[in-house]
Amino acid sequence: MKNIRNFCIIAHIDHGKSTLADRLLEYTNTVSGKDLQDQVLDNMDLERERGITIKSHAIQMDYEMDGEKYVLNLIDTPGHVDFSYEVSRSIAACEGALLIVDAAQGIQAQTISNLYMAIENDLTIIPIVNKVDLPSAMPEEVEDQIIELLGCDRSEIIRASGKTGQGVDQILRAIVEQVPAPAGDPDAPLQCLIFDSVFNPFRGIIAYFKVVNGSIRKGDHVKFIATEKEYDADEVGVLRLDMEPRSEVKTGDVGYIISGIKTSREVKVGDTITHVAKPAKEAIAGFEEVKPMVFAGVYPIEAEDFENLRTSLEKLQLNDASLTFQPESSVALGFGFRCGFLGLLHMEIVQERLDREFNMNVITTVPNVSYKVYDKKGGCKEVHNPSGLPEPTLIDHIEEPFIRASVITNTAYIGPIMTLCLGKRGVLVKQEYISGDRVEIFYDLPLGEIVIDFYDKLKSISKGYASFDYHLHDFRESKLVKLDILLNGEPVDALSTLTHVDNSVTFGQRMCEKLKELIPRQQFEIAIQAAIGAKIIARETIKPVRKDVTAKCYGGDISRKRKLLEKQKEGKKRMKQIGTVEVPQKAFLAVLKLD
């Protein structure tokens, strides 16, 4: 046990941690040359393409130093803000962390938030400046930032490059010398911390865990504390490039368990595994149920695909326990599901995976957040969907979730960023200068304003330099109204949104204009209206396409032409009464991209 080292890598998106991890695997001969592809640990195609890590991964390496053999367990963590709970559980399974900072970009918001998490868990931090081979690298300046943040010595910072392999041996030495061995009791009752689970179509759910106390053997009868379910350990083992079965996984080691579990709801990240015969007195601290933050309706384009969509979502849920869904129906779109996501990136990834892995074409409605609605009698209910809102006369007030956001940016872009945050109803909390030309700005913002396009706009006004991180802060009372969109007097429930009173008129006008561009012209006139309650606040009209019925009349009496025109008008009127308006998928998504 004294020769085991468990460590994770903390880095902002695109700071090169997956590439550096590849070098570590190569250097310790965990991966042979023929198996080596870029980003070995990112095993979903989507992860490689987007260059982000979505799931936590783990891999074991052997390393020999000064004649001693060591076992190093690298637990790779997602770097994106949506997956911060997964990161926190992965960090809890480690004793040390490599803090990787891009030599060209410096410290970013995500790096800082994950670093604080690591420091809270008492991890040993090994600072690394990566990508020093880039022509635009500024290693000295970035080292100054790290020293200011960590208060470490300049000599402790390792300069490395994932591309050329520079500094890899120093990193491995530092891991062995500085990261403490796991402190567990081999004779205590079994406690394993689950930090991830994956779904295998043949073996069911495979849980990845770190043994904190005791040890687990093949064939043991075990119990998962949070779900109180019991299983037999059909197979336990360690995670090399593939899974390697072992008869026993000892204290401090990282391994996997296969026990024929069918659904991901039974394996919760952060749960504790213990023996049924000799159970641990308590679970490992820090487990929490992950709560979705952003909700959206997901509907199949073809109505008969409803059951397929259900099975696809269930399969995705096997691999992604933070996705929640329940059936709902909409007048405009038929039957579908109300899905809960951790954040916008998570929502996009789920959509892409539905498309790629299951070939499902879906329509997604406008995302919204969950609101607390208080009625006049003092009761409170959570509303995830604008159509679930009670009558306005019954509502006393509505509270919406606020987040505390931290934006790190170059001082040149402070003005435009503050304008953006004010436009989103933000309240400035404080600002701190990190170094001469970098500043961290803290804002309280309503989550509902952020879910749509905040991140894209932030990136574009700061030329890609600003980075953004947030956590839920509290619920606050807001003046919110439900905005309905009517087509020819019929409300389209999938386009309803909750919006703030001050922005409602401009938002309604922009929605109508956008829909006018996107809905194709019909044989009859279409009125697009935005309404709050019974009051219409904006309107656009799509003119009908019409045939020139008087073309075949040459000269002659005007009454003949008038008769034909009247006849056409009658026909159009009848059409309008029975005609339905098709709303294309683009229109539902356009709401997200209103500028």
From Swiss-Prot:
GO terms for biological process: positive regulation of translation. Residues 2-183 form the tr-type G domain. InterPro entries: EF-4, EFG_III/V, EFG_V-like, EFTu-like_2, LepA_C_sf, LepA_CTD, LepA_IV, P-loop_NTPase. It holds the Pfam family LepA_C. Keywords: Cell inner membrane, Cell membrane, GTP-binding, Hydrolase, Membrane, Nucleotide-binding, Protein biosynthesis. One of its GO terms (molecular function) is GTP binding. SUPFAM superfamilies: EF-G C-terminal domain-like, P-loop containing nucleoside triphosphate hydrolases, Translation proteins. It catalyses: GTP + H2O = GDP + phosphate + H(+). Disulfide bonds: none annotated. It comes from the Bacteria. Its EC number is 3.6.5.n1. It is a peripheral membrane protein. GTP binds at residues 14-19, 130-133. One of its GO terms (cellular component) is plasma membrane. It is found in: Cell inner membrane. NCBIfam families: lepA (TIGR01393), small_GTP (TIGR00231). Belongs to the TRAFAC class translation factor GTPase superfamily. Classic translation factor GTPase family. LepA subfamily. Required for accurate and efficient protein synthesis under certain stress conditions. May act as a fidelity factor of the translation reaction, by catalyzing a one-codon backward translocation of tRNAs on improperly translocated ribosomes. Back-translocation proceeds from a post-translocation (POST) complex to a pre-translocation (PRE) complex, thus giving elongation factor G a second chance to translocate the tRNAs correctly. Binds to ribosomes in a GTP-dependent manner. This is Elongation factor 4. It comes from Porphyromonas gingivalis (strain ATCC 33277 / DSM 20709 / CIP 103683 / JCM 12257 / NCTC 11834 / 2561). The lineage of its organism: Bacteria, Pseudomonadati, Bacteroidota, Bacteroidia, Bacteroidales. The gene is lepA.
